[in-house]
Curated annotation (Swiss-Prot):
Subcellular location: Secreted, Cell wall, S-layer
Name by which UniProt lists this protein: S-layer protein
Species classification: Bacteria, Pseudomonadati, Campylobacterota, Epsilonproteobacteria, Campylobacterales
Record keywords: Calcium, Cell wall, S-layer, Secreted, Virulence
Organism for this UniProt entry: Campylobacter fetus
Gene name of the encoded protein: sapA
Function: The S-layer is a paracrystalline mono-layered assembly of proteins which coats the surface of bacteria. This protein is critical for virulence.
Source organism, top-level taxon: Bacteria
Chief site of localization: secreted
Length: 939
């Protein structure tokens, strides 16, 4: 059988709080009625809302160490027992062997979380240090004492966190007596319900009990036949206890439309009321004049309209709610002040313990509340400000304002939370300010958070404006969907920033002119992180290795160097070095597929030796000559800007040039060299990355001084053509190049591409014998009628819609990759200089419009088996095609030939006639100006 203390110990370890009487009894009865032990009950209690609130994400799989650490923190008040924490973590993650800090190998049994809690409780009570045992038992005794004090008592009026505070205050066994005294004080304030009296229309003469009685009455204001149940003729004596009068004031049935509630009407109705500690006035009337309620413990006043002034010395609480403006409000009591109004012009509550003010459609001014430890202000409506003139005892201030959040004097404030505000102004001495939280705030001006060392941003941004802090070590917590902050860190020397980037999109930048930050360490589970550290001269250390997403980091100062340490995590990170020199000892290190952006002046072999595990380099300015061949960049060298001068890039055989600018090479030459061209098949690889800037890549033009040049000794050019991010089907990449010694062009990717020359069509491709786009998931466009290829060249199209123009040349066009392809046939080749097309199929076409006169005629030629190719060609051109071109096709030696006769002569003339050869024996037909496969379909 369990007892009350067993349940108290579970409350402490599972919910971090003392057990209230009814809750302790419920769980105790449940356990004993179901014959549950401590561990079994713990498993059930772990599913309770209280456990979920206390443990949070540490209950989730993968966070078992956080779960154990939380228990240590609340049960023992410290987390220094690393071996113990690791031991229990091992137990709830399947058990097995555990090696402690001394090297001892310990066998650990597998436990459920409930078993763990039971075992830990047993260990704390029956093992471990005497001090830990005494602390835990003192906490359990405090919980038992609170359970006894609150059994069958209403504790809903206690401040949130009271039960947790009772446990957290015990840091040694000697603290128990102090906490018991606090519980005694709380008990004396708890309601002790007595009788409820509903007043009658007659003259009541009532005396309450010694308990907390309640009296309910209604006063009808103005003329009418309704009779009040609360009037000057009633005699109400609350007697002992803490008694409450609920008084309703409403218009009588014949009252004038302008009837209002004033102090005189209230005083008249309360004339016979004595020994009542709490009063609640509720009215649907607008008010008139001034109101004073003195001599009460609690005052409630819920009315309509404006209140010129309101004053009370209520000792425990005052709660006022109205729809209009409160011009002046004075609370002289020592309790809580809660006010809701349309507007609060001036409020003074210098003895109140806490102040909570809400303006439903206008501004708030808290004039003075110099005893309150907690102050909360909230405004609504467009651009409505909240101002605290003086709150010099408040440790915690929350301002939720749609306009400016202003604090003139708050010398004791430690934690400041600002929600939704567009600006924050903090004045006076705030030396104790430690934490500032901006929640869904979009600041339109710079703010100074004094020496606060912790800054929390939840879905907040500063829109380029500074948040200044003089703290030496600053922690910035970003959360929500997007959180962006610009810091002006003004500590004299060695200022550090610890960034916890848990928003989806995170951004940290600095006021580069004045910031003194030396290091930034980032962690978190966000998707993206931007750290703009460029031009902050003191910032030399950046570490994002513990950030799970993709980081974008800039550092260095323009034109300068320094000793830097920049380390990034496993995401695909981007690093920008805006300086020129990495001093010896610098470390630039990545872990994912990372990119570093560098200016051309920084592209030196000395700098390269200090860059590790960075796959890509981006050249961030115009560059004349850059030798990247000695670098360890593996995947790509990226050109990001339009070049203003001729550029020469030297790379090694393992590197790739990735062109991302939509106009790269359109102004000057870009020459690509390999550092070693001694092999027989030296390869240069380039990528046309239209997705990077969401624009098609136009690499070079058909001009000798504005194109891509592949230098001597390079035999193969590999091109990857990639689509744009938006409307990818519209991507049209182009390359105009001079291919000095290139014999093969190999193309892959998913974007259509056009290959062109660099101004000299006769020689720019003159050694190319293979253009292979068979791995391209798009179409290839190439004009072999205008660009001279090497002897017996082959062109292989992609799987998209290719467009290949030919006029002979004894080249082979292979359409094996598929797609609906177009072969454009030009005049100008001899009958012995024939292009061959392989894999010509239904859907493909031969465009013969170039040889068209008038209207095409079309027929199939057949001849005797002893006829040779010249016989067939002679017959095809024997007619008069000068008026209407004659299109003929015939089958010969396993091939299909198409001839267009565009002259009256009986011989083949290259100026007017043309011929093409298709592999295989095909049935053809004419479709407009195109020859296509006759597959039986109707055109």
């Amino acid at each position: 059988m369990l007892n009350k203390t067993d349940v108290s110990m579970l409350y402490i370890t599972i919910m971090g709080m003392a057990s209230e009487g009814d809750g302790n009894k419920y769980w105790l009865d449940y356990a004993n009625n179901n014959s549950l032990g401590v561990s079994s009950l713990a498993n059930i209690m772990l599913d309770s809302p209280g456990a979920a609130k206390f443990f949070g994400d540490s209950l989730l799989a993968g966070n078992e160490k956080d779960f154990v650490t939380k228990i240590y923190s609340i049960a023992l008040g410290n987390t220094s027992d690393v071996d113990g924490i690791n031991y229990w973590t091992k137990a709830i993650t399947g058990g097995g062997e555990f090696t402690d800090s001394k090297g001892n190998v310990i066998s650990v049994a597998s436990l459920s979380k409930g078993d763990l809690i039971g075992a830990m409780i047993n260990s704390m009570v029956n093992g471990g240090s005497a001090e830990s045992k005494a602390i835990f038992e003192a906490k359990a005794a405090a919980s038992d004492y609170f359970a006894d004090a609150t059994l069958v008592r209403d504790i809903s009026g206690l401040d949130e966190g009271t039960t947790s505070k009772l446990i957290s205050e015990i840091n040694s066994a000697s603290d128990l007596d102090k906490v018991k005294s606090e519980i005694d004080a709380l008990k004396s304030e708890l309601p002790n319900p007595g009788s409820t009296y509903d007043l009658t229309e007659g003259n009541d003469n009532l005396k309450g009990t010694d308990l907390d009685d309640t009296f309910n009455g209604t006063t009808y204001v103005g003329n009418g036949t309704n009779k009040s149940t609360l009037s000057a003729f009633d005699k109400i004596d609350g007697g002992a206890g803490r008694d409450t009068l609920n008084a309703i004031f409403t218009a009588n049935n014949n009252a004038a439309a302008a009837t209002k509630l004033d102090q005189a009407e209230i005083d008249k109705s309360l004339k016979g009321v004595t020994n009542v500690e709490n009063i609640n006035i509720i009215s649907d009337l607008e008010t008139s004049g001034d109101f004073v309620f003195n001599g009460y413990e609690k005052v409630g006043f819920n009315v309509l309209g404006d209140i010129v002034s309101f004053a009370t010395d209520a000792s425990k609480s005052v709660n006022v709610e109205t729809t209009g403006t409160i011009t002046a409000f004075t609370a002289a009591g020592t309790g809580k002040v809660d006010v809701v109004a349309g507007k609060i012009s001036a409020l003074t509550a210098d003895s109140a313990t806490s102040v909570n003010l809400t303006a439903t459609n206008d501004t708030i001014t808290l004039t003075s509340a110099n005893a309150a430890t907690s102050v909360n202000l909230k405004t609504s409506g467009a651009a409505k400000s909240a101002t605290i003139t003086s709150a010099n005892a408040a440790k915690n201030i929350t301002i939720d304002a749609t306009g400016v959040a202003a604090v003139t004097s708050a010398t004791a404030v430690e934690n400041l939370t600002v929600k939704h505000a567009t600006n924050v102004t903090l004045a006076g001495n705030m030396d104790k300010l430690a934490t500032v939280t901006l929640d869904n705030a979009a600041l339109t001006a710079a703010i100074d958070i004094k020496s606060a060392s912790t800054l929390n941003l939840i879905n907040s941004s500063v829109n380029g404006h500074n948040i200044s802090t003089a703290a030496k070590d600053v922690t910035v917590n970003l959360s929500g969907s997007a959180a962006k902050v610009k810091l002006n860190t003004t500590a004299a020397t060695d200022q550090t920033v610890t960034l916890k980037a848990n928003a989806t999109d995170n951004s940290l930048e600095f006021d580069s002119a004045t910031a003194k930050t030396t290091s930034v360490t980032a962690s978190g589970s966000g998707k993206t992180l931007v750290i703009k550290g460029a031009e902050v001269e003191t910032l030399v250390n950046i570490d994002t290795t513990a950030f799970n997403g993709a980081a974008d980091v800039s550092f260095g100062k323009d034109g300068q160097g320094g000793k830097f340490s920049v380390k990034t995590g496993t995401g695909d990170d981007k690093i920008e070095f805006v300086g020129t020199t990495l001093t010896e000892g610098s470390v630039i290190d990545g872990a994912g597929n990372d990119t570093i952006a560098m200016k051309s002046a920084a592209l030196t072999s000395a700098n390269f030796t200090m860059i590790k595990n960075i796959e890509n380099v981006a050249i961030s300015d115009a560059v004349a000559t850059a030798d990247l061949s000695s670098s360890a960049f593996k995947n790509s060298v990226i050109i990001t800007t339009k070049e203003a001068a001729d550029t020469t890039l030297t790379i090694n055989k393992d590197q790739v040039i990735n062109f991302t600018a939509a106009d790269a090479g359109s102004v000057k030459l870009i020459t690509v060299k390999l550092n070693d061209v001694t092999g027989a098949n030296d390869v240069v690889k380039i990528v046309l990355d239209a997705a990077a800037k969401d624009a098609s890549i136009a690499l070079g033009t058909a001009a000798a001084d504005k194109a891509l040049v592949i230098d001597t000794g390079i035999e193969t050019l590999n091109i990857t053509s990639l689509v744009k991010a938006t409307s990818p089907e519209t991507t049209a990449n182009t390359v105009n190049a001079k291919l000095t010694d290139v014999t093969s062009i190999i193309i892959d990717g998913d974007a259509k591409i056009t290959l062109g020359h660099a101004g000299t069509a006769g020689t720019d491709y003159s050694k190319v014998s293979m253009i292979d786009a068979s791995a391209l998931k798009a179409g290839l466009t190439f004009d072999a009628s205008a660009i001279t290829l090497g002897a017996n060249a082959t062109i292989k199209g992609g799987s998209g819609a290719d467009s290949i123009t030919v006029k002979g040349g004894n080249i082979v066009v292979d359409l094996v990759a598929g797609g609906d392809d177009t072969i454009t046939l030009k005049k100008g080749a001899e009958k012995t200089d024939i292009t061959t097309v392989n894999n010509f199929n239904a859907g493909d076409k031969i465009d013969i419009a170039d040889a068209k006169n008038g209207t095409f005629t079309f027929n199939k030629i057949t001849m005797n088996s002893d006829a040779n190719l010249d016989d067939y060609i002679t017959k095809a051109v024997a007619g008069d095609g000068s008026t209407n071109s004659a299109v003929s096709y015939f089958l010969h030696n396993g091939y299909t030939y198409v001839v267009v006769d565009g002259t009256a002569g009986a011989t083949f003339t290259k100026a007017t006639d043309t011929i093409i050869k298709l592999s295989g024996t095909l049935d053809l037909k004419l479709s407009g100006d195109n020859v296509v496969v006759d597959d039986g379909s109707v055109i």
